[in-house]
Amino acid sequence: MITFLSGGTGTPKLLSGMPHNADTVVIGNTGDDIEMGDLLVCPDLDTVMYLSSGILDRKKWWGIKGDTFGTHDYLVELAKERGWDGNPNFLKKNEQISGKRIANWRRFSGGEEFMKIGDRDRLFHKLRSRLIEEGKTLTEVTENLCSVLKTDVKLLPMSDDPVSSILQTDLGEMHFQAFWAGWKGKPEVENIEFRGSETAKTTRFVVDALKNEVIIGPSNPVTSIGPILSLKGIEELLSETKVVAVSPFIGDKSFSGPIKKLMMAKGYEANTSGLMEMYPFVDVFVIDSNDKTRIDRPMVRTDIRIDCKSDAMRVYEACLKAFEKMEKK
């Protein structure tokens, strides 16, 4: 059995190369989760859930293929009629810590929908929110939704407690989704905080899953994997098992997302060397054949670009070779 740490689109693209019905557990990042109005949106969980059930829109790598956006478009139209400027409306501090705890520091106005949500996708967010209100944990709700969709992996949220990726920027404090989906990654980033991680707890399911061999896919190491690592005890658990990480870099170039800006804000070089510094518990890295970064850690080289299923299969096979290189822990 293999456990993946997943967030964003990097690890899901790698997962697309897994053999069908492989014995796989995925621990999903929830630092990107937000609440807009009455919708609890869990983007990184949803991407894996939709991928493993065969309904993911693989052109965008988010949302449901063939979805429509009538409700979203009309909400935006109404908001603009009321004078909305199109920017995210992150609620004030006193509103962030009132209501159900899972939405703490994740609350945005529901009347100003800066994130594009499809009509079918919206129904899953609505169902998730209703089940949470009925007293179920996020782990229980995720299991319920995966059962409905007949997913072929076991998907676990990193925690049932709220952890929010909060960025300090030149425009002020903002949630990661405001920075990325709202402001398109344009603000300058000064620091990143995983708010709530100091009190959030891992579940026993996550602890058990981290006893398996672990693969960290080529996801953003700061905001896709960082929230998972910020939880108490996670890095210690990873240091006790076999871990392979796939670099999201070819030299100083990353495949997608605001990795460079975010790694520099955390004080790391935005390249494979910086990644290795961020992941001291990793045993073997899978890096690109053309990556000229000087490396003093065990590695396997391959073409790490993932544009199709055969690419994903190639990178996954490189991960298996990486496990073969390790001594027993």
Give the role of each language-model region.
Residues M1-T3:
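Extreme N-terminal starter segment of soluble prokaryotic enzymes
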Residues M18-N21, E235-T241, Y279-P280:
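Short, conserved loop/helix-junction motifs that constitute active-site signature segments
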Residues V25-N29, K242-F249, V284-S289:
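Short internal beta-strands
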Residues N29-E193:
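Electropositive, gly/pro-rich neighborhoods at or near active sites that engage anionic ligands
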Residues T139, E190-D208:
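Active-site glycine-rich loop that binds ribose-phosphate moieties when present
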Residues G196-E198, N220-L231:
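Active-site glycine- and acidic-residue-rich loops that bind
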Residues G226-K266:
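Redox- and metal-dependent alpha/beta enzyme cores, enriched for Fe-S-associated oxidoreductases
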Residues F255-K329:
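C-terminal functional extensions of proteins
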